[in-house]
């Protein structure tokens, strides 16, 4: 599915396109020593994945994060992988963050180091797992995107109701 990417920034991509892997957002306020230092950063295109090795309660061995926000650059400390087969971006965003799927793979392709896990690239690339057809990936990805959209809408509605409740309580007990 993926191949390791070692494509470096040729200097044409500035800090305005720096992507923080932890939150998958563009982060412009990072300080770099020079424009030359930006050439040590990897290019990180839509559909690429990067490994973040921090252990958490949700991700025992670290996690992969898929770039779904736009082409940019990431620090050279992250392993970046580029897709080599056609696949559905939305499906893989959910699949690579599914601990049930990835735990077995990452337990065999990472090694513990100080405060985090390091990915052993060759071990990861030698892992295999069953993948749905492209058509199934599209349906599954769309389903979860729709579900996320519904959750967001209900969260907004809940916030508005909380504000309304607070206002009513304030007026009632004046």
Stretch-by-stretch model annotation:
Residues 1-174:
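Feature detects amphipathic, helix-rich regulatory segments
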């Amino acid at each position: 599915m993926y191949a390791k990417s070692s494509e470096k920034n040729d200097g044409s991509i500035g800090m305005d396109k720096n992507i923080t892997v932890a939150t998958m957002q563009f982060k412009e306020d990072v300080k770099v020593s020079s424009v030359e230092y930006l050439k040590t950063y990897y290019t990180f295109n839509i559909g690429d994945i990067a490994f973040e090795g921090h252990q958490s309660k949700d991700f025992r061995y670290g996690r992969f994060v898929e770039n779904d926000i736009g082409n940019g650059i990431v620090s050279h400390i992250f392993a970046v992988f580029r897709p080599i087969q056609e696949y559905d971006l939305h499906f893989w965003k959910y699949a690579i963050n599914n601990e049930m799927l990835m735990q077995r793979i990452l337990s065999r392709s990472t090694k513990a180091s100080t405060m985090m896990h390091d990915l052993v690239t060759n071990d990861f690339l030698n892992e295999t797992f069953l993948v749905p057809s492209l058509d199934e990936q599209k349906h599954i990805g769309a389903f979860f995107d729709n579900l996320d959209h519904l959750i967001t809408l209900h969260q907004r509605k809940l916030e508005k109701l909380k504000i309304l409740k607070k206002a009513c309580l304030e007026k009632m007990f004046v």
